[in-house]
Amino acid sequence: MDHHKQLTLQTTLESCNNLYNLLFNSIGSIKPSQQQQQQQQNQKNTNSVTSNTNIINDQEIFKLNKFHLYGENNIDELYNSIELQLQTIKFTCQQYRQWDSTERDSIKFFNTQKLYNQSQQRGNLVSKTLFDCSLLGKIYLNQQKEQQQQQKQKNKQQQQQPQPLVEDLSKNISKTVEVKRKLGLLAGKLQEMTNELNNKYSTFSVLDDLLGLLKSNTEIDYNSDSYVSCNISSSTFLLDIDIYHNGEIKEVKLVHILTTTGEVEPAEQQFNDELTNSLKTDMKEFIKKVQRICDLDLLFRKYKHFDLQKAFSILQSDFLNISINSNIKYIDNKEIEMNKGFGEIKLDCCGVLIKYFQSYIEKISKMNEPYSIMIEMESSAVTNNGSLIDQSEYSRLSLKTLLQKQQHTQPSAQTDYSEQQQQQSISTQLTSIEFNEKDCLDCEPLSSMLESDSIFSPVRLVCKLNKPILITNQQLSKILNLSKIHRSSQQPSQQQPSQQQQQQQQQQQQKKLNSVDESMNENGDSNIIENINELIKKYSIQNLLISSSSSSSSSNDSNISVNVDNSFDCEVYGMKQRYYYTGEFELGIEISRIPIYHPSQVYPTIQLLRQQIVFNILFKSCFQNLNISKSDDHHNIIDNNNDVKIFEITSNPPNSINIIFLHPIDNSFNSIDIFIKNNGDLEAFYYDNTTNIQPNIQKSTLFTKMLIKSLSISVSLACFFKNK
């Protein structure tokens, strides 16, 4: 019994440990190998570990730039799963205590459970073996029978009309074999997918008709319009897959089941067409779409006390109204709608897809997909007492309304002046930025807005980026401040700490900082400051952008390591260029998702992302190869330095980039200041001399036009000097 209890507890602990490892891998922390652990243990035993060694080991194990809540996975959901596993361990231990009091019953229970599990496993194994043997046997018998029938037909046809009928028969046989093979592959992939869905989401799948067609011994007319149906179902959806007898996909149909009334509501035809095309062309893409449908269904079932389906319909209705108004406004210029307006909005079966940026070069070359976000629902964080931390509001309120609501909210009597000043600074910071696309295109409904049109959901919204984006901390803070405005407008009367309490907290924090400084001075560890500066430089957005551009342009040589300390040479349209980065460093992180709490946050977020994307593209354009042949060395150094134009780059991401260079004819230092607005608009100012106050208007206008079209500093400079 003790051995069985130990195994049961060990199984639970292993499950919890796997979830911990999944959490750490998701946020960028890599579990050290056994060899690394042994080396660290040996170093500890010999007391020879230095602070520098610890820092290096920590950097190898822990990826600092990925430790945030905006990566690919939902960290809160993983954390909640771990909490659930810990509760399971707690209840298991409590159950053990009860079993110890009744030892005899426990022995009988465990023996019975053990025999039951063994019998069930053996029964499942026997059933699976019988099913596989039956399937293989039927296929074999079917092939034998078909061969006999074909041989008989062949003999008869040879007697009547030998040559033509034999050829037709061979074609039919080959076609039958091909169709059987196609049906078998499709059935295998669908069965593998449905088994995974059934285990992960507790869905119910039926593939009997397809398997029956595959095992059928009767002759089938593969040219007819007959088809079989397979389906995947759950509490809130039904997915029908119609397949022709020749193995071609007829149609995929999605049906929604309302949890409140149980009524069946067919999905939009465009959603069915997307599912059908993905199943025909890309099975992996189809599986991802079905998994997203199951994820949404899992949320609907988890929060069945709340009508999430209504919240989801309100969300799609809001963006449908925005899409209609946006199409009317930009009916003659879709490029401006994509890059300057709200974006190209398209409803999805599990959310809302918004394509918000695509450069001119990418559009005409069709090399890359546009930048886009997918707005979906996801689980939010939970406090210790089980209450939800994050809640999203689904309504047709604009961001301007939220700002006005907060500005007109009267603070409570206990609210401190510093808190009021902080809230006012947030509002001022955001209102000073030109966010409103005419207040989100006046997306209120045509009829008067009802109270039921604004509801709060226990799950939050999330904007999932189709491409990870490197973003500065400053830009990310602006996005997070949008959430602060929404939350403060939800709870205007929340009691704030008094001024005395805030002063006490500040004094305690200051004492902690002073103690840390004193300990650093006593130890004389000046290397810590150097290490911090090195980390800031390593994880700066400038270094990350240069590293990504150099790795993509020199993918053939994995040993190349280009960073901000190196110069970078390139040749564009016959002009040899060399770039140095001599500016300050700004910390940056890579984000893949942005949680939001109100649909009105989407447009300001898109504007800030456009600004960051344009900065990233321009900055990287100085440090990547364009239609040139590489030299033999690792850094692509141009051998002949006589005709090389040298440019020094400084930046204030994502707002501006400054270029300083020596003019080849005037022998004077010229400079170009490039300013990037929050919506991605560009404006360049060309100064004939760094001492000049006024820019050259003609050159500034010309260089701005080149930048807007090319979104490349190196290309614009080459064309600019060639034009002169």
Curated annotation (Swiss-Prot):
- Could you name the Gene Ontology cellular component terms for this entry? mediator complex
Pfam families given in the database record:
Med1
The UniProt regions of compositional bias labelled Polar residues, in chain numbering, are 511-524
> Is this entry keyworded Ligase?
no
Record-level GO BP terms: positive regulation of transcription by RNA polymerase II
Instruction: Name the source's superkingdom.
Output: Eukaryota
Q: Which residue ranges does the record annotate as region Disordered?
A: 33-52, 147-167, 486-524
Q: Where is the composition biased (Low complexity)?
A: 147-164, 488-510
**Localization per Swiss-Prot or TrEMBL:** Nucleus
PANTHER family attached to this UniProt entry: MEDIATOR OF RNA POLYMERASE II TRANSCRIPTION SUBUNIT 1 (PTHR12881:SF10)
The protein here is known as Putative mediator of RNA polymerase II transcription subunit 1
Q: What is the lineage of its organism?
A: Eukaryota, Amoebozoa, Evosea, Eumycetozoa, Dictyostelia
